Amino acid sequence: MFQIFRGSPALSEFRLNQLSARFQKADLPVKSCYAEYLHFADLSAGLSAEETDELEQLLHYGPTLAQHESKGECFVVIPRVGTISSWSSKATDIAHNCGLDKVVRLERGIAYYFEFERTLSAEQQQRLVSHIHDRMMETVVRAPEQAAVLFDSQDPKPFTTVDILNGGRKALEIANVELGLALASDEMDYLVENFTALGRNPNDIELYMFAQANSEHCRHKIFNADWVIDGEKQEKSLFKMIKNTFEKTPDHVLSAYKDNAAVMEGSKVGRFFADQDGQYRYHNEDAHILMKVETHNHPTAISPFPGAATGSGGEIRDEGATGRGAKPKAGLVGFSVSNLVIPGFEQPWENELSKPSRISSALDIMIEGPLGGAAFNNEFGRPALLGYFRTYEEKVNSFAGEEVRGYHKPIMLAGGIGNIRAEHVQKGEIPVGAKLIVLGGPAMNIGLGGGAASSMTSGKSKEDLDFASVQRDNPEMERRCQEVIDRCWQMGEGNPIAFIHDVGAGGLSNAMPELVHDGGRGGKFELRNILCDERGMSPLEIWCNESQERYVLAVAPENLAVFEELCQRERAPYAIIGEATEEEHLTLHDNHFDNNPIDLPMSLLLGKTPKMTRDVKSTQVNNSPVDQTNIELKEAFHRVLRLPVVAEKTFLITIGDRTVTGMVARDQMVGPWQIPVSDVAVTTAALDTYHGEAMSIGERAPVALLDFAASARLAVAESITNIAATNIGDIKRIKLSANWMSAAGHEGEDAGLYEAVKAVGEELCPALGLTVPVGKDSMSMKTTWSENGEQKTVTAPLSLVISAFARVEDVRKTVTPQLRTDKGETALLLIDLGEGKNRLGATALAQVYKQLGDKPADVVNVELLKGFYNAMQTLVQQGKLLAYHDRSDGGLIVTLAEMAFAGNCGIRAEISALGDNDLGILFSEELGAVIQVRESDLAAVREVLTQHGLIHLTKDLGLVTEYDEFEIKRGTKVVLSEKRSELRGIWAELTHQMQRLRDNPECADQEFAAKKDPANQGFSAHLTYDINEDVAAPYIATGKKPRIAVLREQGVNSHVEMGAAFDRAGFEAIDVHMSDLHTARQNLKDFNALVACGGFSYGDVLGAGGGWAKSVLFNTALRDQFQAFFEREDTLALGVCNGCQMISTLADIIPGTENWPRFVRNTSERFEARAALVRINESNSVWFQGMAGSHMPIAVSHGEGRVEFKNDSQLQGLRDQGLIIAQYVDNNIRPTEVYPANPNGSVDGITALSNTNGRVAIMMPHPERVFRTVSNSWHPEDWSEDGAWMRLFRNARVFFK
């Protein structure tokens, strides 16, 4: 039964204005446009009046927007037919958890109503439709009733065979094209030979499985190939040269090259998690460090948001599936694209070169892709702390002559770190008879052939196969799966997981064979046991689809009951689909058709397939130096500040949660002005320690257009000069991930790849003592297409991205680029590892003048690089550095500018001692760093530099001033003189333009104005209480511990740090899942307090916190239980972020909350992750006693934090009752509604509220993430261990005496 429910308006006024502007630009005669949500319900039976009312209440969410009459021509945008959106999965979950069992499935669309000035032609209709939907993910129908097609059910399809016994190799060649298998010629020979020997034809599913498992993407054939270069056989494969780094420096590596991620030694710390009895405790143990970096380039080119989202999701699964289960912790992302060509902001170096229609533009990729990557990390609950962004697209003379080099096929980088227990680093044994399980969501007909598709040059596959390889993200599902994995590894030796892999490229067709093969087993499987949301799928589609958020596991039969219980508690779907066998044979049975779609020996699938030989020739490049004739320094500087690789990247950073876990010690944003210039990301190893982990990135791809090896060396070296800013110690503690992107087969590129790998694996890394225990390759970085009968090609430069990871001794010693003006007399020093060469080839300067140059920067002296690292480590350890920033993209002038921006100060630099060529001195990208030291420490610093052989490379640069100036002189001659604030504005223009396109332009304008304001005072803190006083200490001393329910729903992700804050305040913190209350495993009557935690319950579907709250309100027993708890006079309750939204929705059952608002989408219409300044008001709130009059920063991470009242009298009522506990304030400590000081646009800056009795508080910011000083992005230097917000938790303990 199909039913339609009208929803609220879908687009705000500024979104409608943006859409109208696009129509106008496209010359479409649109007179008016209105859009509203439509909800479609697939019902097993008709709903009663009460059920209909409940469902309508569920489907009422979002901000109140102006409603219009639905008139004009209707176009309804729905999910692509044959797919199920992640919104649908979550909304359906909510309906079921609210008791609406007749709902089979919910889906959502947007109905657009247009009035036109004249009738549209068919071509105009097509253009109109292209502006309102994403063809890769959505379909347009002309009437709401036509959306019923979403729920059409078909009979299962059988497998097909390819007749090679009669048709021979030719039959396989046809299947290779039609199925998009990307099989090589020798692989086709191998398959024909082996199936002929078996005496049968292959089934389509078997061929598909073989193609995925043996694709370049999965098998890394080029990195394992034999090489002949210029007729000379090479001694080693690429992979052997990478492995050489481990052979030379195995120190501190616990696992390399054999698992989903590499593992190195970590620190012994108190890991905080809930035991099996539910109580949170510290566990003193080794927290070893795992690391992984992936790329997801092809899917991001085709459909940027889901491509980047599932890129991050897949890498997170790699971490969680390491060993016998691990914990992902912090992430990084990166993007390389062609020129942006932002309308109205076109730059002199940008030409609007063409692209094929099947791929997204660079601008679209950088609008949608980062949102996808951030959204997945946010919803999963992993802070994204590091990244890079490069644009390149230019016709240059390189190794293949003059041609266009660029990133039409983008790089989308996703990586991170995690932690793992010592006993779980290695996989276990898979016993015969072990249950083979898929953990996670159902199979869907999406993401088919991703492994093979990503191994092809863009443009070589059929366009319908590009559609098939688009994936769908559901991070909230992955979070549920991770919670199960966490419960498993937290059981220590009792961990029920024997073996685990993630499901990625190739789906189960790759994951399950890999699982049993790695365990030395075979497997018998039942196809119809696989959870499947689409009945009509064929065996190939069920087995080979790449539905995300899935893991495959082996669990011994005796441990199965424990595992199932954990899954049920976390509401994580799972299916037992097979058993491990002694014989290494793979059988897949299909109950529906009673046949075997797969019946193969494992040796055929994963055995000795033909080994590749690369017989290639090297080429030379012959270029001219950068022509400096018409380059004026000021203009050059302004251009470079606007180049994306240099420009401020706030638009890529504040969309990503950077505080979740409460263990982030250094994110991108630096200092009181929160400038995104940090060289390194740093986390604490646990919530009770200053030991930690660090990550950095190094990448210099354009250099490869001149010198392959130099580009690779610079990438490694830059990762070291970046990570040197924190307290690591021995360089052997640093481990690298190498991600290689190349257009294999393109003239000169193969030999260049070999040269680059050799430079890293055989030479530089062994010399430095560095190991590369993990990495990834993407060998098809080329886009070809035909345009007006002409063949076009855009080829990416060889691109090596190095990610460096290390254990940190003391996270507090990390040095930032923020120049200090409050430390007395100081000096600026340049340590020039380029030894004065100042080469300009392949620099930002060359790029902005459409040049390439001849000689690029390079590692001049390996020993000096090592000495530099050791010297910086000594100075970091001794606390001698006030500021540190490496020289990289843009050169010395950018290094100095970014340091001045971070310090909101002036610079007077003197460059006479650095050489004769101003452009070379200021814009060369040679290795090095600028440091700021106290005059009183100068002698000691020079002594350390002398000891490490660097004193002859150390140059005095000049002074830091308190003025709004940026001056560079050569003797008495002024080379450049500008206002720092004006340069700050130029540097911010890219972010401003991107935010105006993507977000609310009014918010973008407000933030841009704040950045340029020379009077901006930055953050400050003033506390009216003693930060070091533990007001709860006398009550903790009694030994009594009030019990607090740390409440979470599926998708909540901030519960562990919340438990830690209450544990420190003297509570017995208990992990309580909503499923515990539903099943009566727990009851709120047994608790003194409850806290509803932050995150993304149900992925914020049906309104943030709304689904969670309504699962209480629509369940009589739960509603009564919560109401009784709130009405008791001996209880406290706190709601933070998602918990704030949830508890505000429960206002009807909480005394004294009649004036509470609901929380709706931020004014920016963007997830906002920032440090924000708040002021505490006088109130009767138990939680905020003694804090009134204080102001201090706090972590903010939400997309729906704006208060919305039913009427003005509610707001006035809150004011009159004194229930507004805290407000966002500007840097002058005035309550504000101006963005971004007020990140969500709430009236009066409202951000925390109390009920009338003071026992219930709700707040959107996250005090639990900053209860330790070290986890604040900025804090006054006199704060010690406890942060300012620890007082809130201790106040709660005082209440219970």
UniProtKB/Swiss-Prot annotation:
Subcellular location: Cytoplasm
UniProt cross-references to HAMAP family, sorted A to Z: PurL_1
Molecular function via GO: ATP binding; metal ion binding; phosphoribosylformylglycinamidine synthase activity
Chain residue ranges for the region called Disordered: 305-324
Subunit structure and binding partners: Monomer.
UniProt-annotated binding residues for Mg(2+): 679, 718, 722, 886
Keywords, sorted A to Z: ATP-binding, Cytoplasm, Glutamine amidotransferase, Ligase, Magnesium, Metal-binding, Nucleotide-binding, Purine biosynthesis
UniProt key word ATP-binding: yes
Annotated positions binding ATP: 307-318, 888
Ranges where the Glutamine amidotransferase type-1 domain occurs: 1044-1297
PANTHER family: PHOSPHORIBOSYLFORMYLGLYCINAMIDINE SYNTHASE
Broad EC category: ligase
Source species, domain of life: Bacteria
Protein function: Phosphoribosylformylglycinamidine synthase involved in the purines biosynthetic pathway. Catalyzes the ATP-dependent conversion of formylglycinamide ribonucleotide (FGAR) and glutamine to yield formylglycinamidine ribonucleotide (FGAM) and glutamate.
Pathway, per record: Purine metabolism; IMP biosynthesis via de novo pathway; 5-amino-1-(5-phospho-D-ribosyl)imidazole from N(2)-formyl-N(1)-(5-phospho-D-ribosyl)glycinamide: step 1/2
Family membership: In the N-terminal section; belongs to the FGAMS family.
Gene name as annotated: purL
Protein's recorded name: Phosphoribosylformylglycinamidine synthase
EC number: 6.3.5.3
Species in which this protein is naturally found: Mannheimia succiniciproducens (strain KCTC 0769BP / MBEL55E)
